[in-house]
Amino acid sequence: MTDKKVTRLRRARKARLKMHELEVVRLCVFRSSQHIYAQVISADGNKVLASASTLDKELRDGATGNIDAATKVGQLVATRAKAAGVSQVAFDRSGFKYHGRVKALADAAREAGLEF
């Protein structure tokens, strides 16, 4: 693995450990160069309660690797999480900088009703 990826994973591990200690439901984000994925994971970490990505049928036709796509994913994961009975989550950025697509997804999820 590259040094950049190793440091990102180290940051992610530290944040996830803290969330595990607090036993909170988390909104986990992963971004690749072409897509962005979001999952709402239970407090024990064993179950995915809701998920959305740019690979979903509703979002696949449009652009998938930009801020507009991340905003749509954030709105979709928030509505699915609320349908599953989740209203409060901890934001797990997976070691990525809180900037650009990650920030757009988080802001859209907040506007759609999720509390961080």
UniProtKB/Swiss-Prot annotation:
GO molecular function, one term: structural constituent of ribosome
Classification via InterPro entries: Ribosomal_uL18_bac-type, Ribosomal_uL18_bac/euk
UniProt keyword terms in alphabetical order: Ribonucleoprotein, Ribosomal protein, RNA-binding, rRNA-binding
Cellular-component GO terms for this entry: cytosolic large ribosomal subunit
Listed Gene3D superfamilies: 3.30.420.100
SUPFAM superfamilies hit by this protein: Translational machinery components (SSF53137)
Pfam family, one: Ribosomal_L18p
Family: Belongs to the universal ribosomal protein uL18 family.
Function text: This is one of the proteins that bind and probably mediate the attachment of the 5S RNA into the large ribosomal subunit, where it forms part of the central protuberance.
Self-association state and partner proteins as the record states: Part of the 50S ribosomal subunit; part of the 5S rRNA/L5/L18/L25 subcomplex. Contacts the 5S and 23S rRNAs.
The name this protein goes by in its record: Large ribosomal subunit protein uL18
Organism annotation: Pseudomonas fluorescens (strain Pf0-1)
Record gene name: rplR
